[in-house]
Amino acid sequence: MANVVLLYSPSCSACPSAKRLFKELRVKYSFNYREVDITTPDGQELADRHSVRAVPATIINGRLTFIGVPSRQSAEKALAPRPT
């Protein structure tokens, strides 16, 4: 199961769209999801660790995957189960 962390800022105008997208995708794909405010100590630490300089930023399985709001197609591709 994928682990998705969405870094956001309360003042970010695009962040609600990214939040909505990942909440909708949880219906189709099973993944752990967490939203982290970059103005908090936890958010600042994650942003520093992944060199995030803009939000929204999406970390999937510990890897910075998207900066900005991804297209639905790109997000689905990143979340789709990989064949084993």
Annotate each predicted stretch with a short phrase.
Residues 46-49, 77:
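Well-formed, non-transmembrane alpha-helical positions, independent of function
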Residues 31-43:
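Thiol-based oxidoreductase modules, predominantly thioredoxin-like and allied folds used
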Residues 13-14, 41-42, 73:
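Short alpha-helical
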Residues 6-9, 37-38, 69:
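Conserved residues at beta->alpha junctions
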Residues 27-29, 45-46:
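Short polar/charged helix/loop
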Residues 59-84:
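Non-catalytic, surface beta->alpha helical segment in thiol-disulfide oxidoreductase systems
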Residues 50-59:
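Structural micro-motif
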Residues 1-28:
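Local sequence-structure signature of Cys/Sec-based thiol-disulfide redox active-site neighborhoods
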